[in-house]
Amino acid sequence: MSVTLPRILVNLWTQDRSISVLDCAAQMSFFLILGATECFLLAVMAYDRCVAICGPLHCPLVMTPKVCLQLAVGSWVSGIPVQTGKTCWIFSLHFCHLNETNHFFCDNPPILKLACGDTFAHAPSVCVAVLLVAAVPFILILASYSKIVCTILRLPTARRAKAFSTYSSHLLVVLLFFGSATITYLRPKSSYSAGTNRLFSLLYTIVTPMFNPMIYNLQNKDVIAALIKLLLKKVV
């Protein structure tokens, strides 16, 4: 959202929907890098919850400030070489004379449609990039939650609800992020159209990130109390 929304607002304000090739490449690069960063950060957060639930006594020893900093920095820089290389490859293609895309930001599928010739030969490099920045973090998240579920099932019934509340918000964010990304980029080609592409991209880039703060804040008792108080005032 921090990459796509500012440009959308500028376009709406100026009514100028053109963008230079350099700006388009920069927007795509930052969009891909920040997307990869979120994947790795979600994997790190899943690991943090796994340590907190499966080994609460060892959590302060495992998740030290130094380790947390290293994991955070690693999440930020891991996607840079892969996604920068992917962007350079896309913009090194030969593009046809058509330079108009029916989309509201520079995303991979609409830009690749402008390329002349067959881009299928470069599919393996794209698959490797997706595997590194999306599939690997998702597998790590599944592994963390598998261990969490196995641990919770061994807990007494009274403690299960408390343990579930520890990771429920993060699990919901993971489902929203990877679910919307899957619908946007991995749905069947027969369902592709300019209108549906824009709709799903809007869901993935703007709507889903807006829900994240709400999901995490609803785990805060003070926030819930303030929200109930506000709703009661409106009812009265």
Give names to the regions the model predicted:
Residues 1-236:
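Transmembrane helical core of 7TM receptor-like proteins
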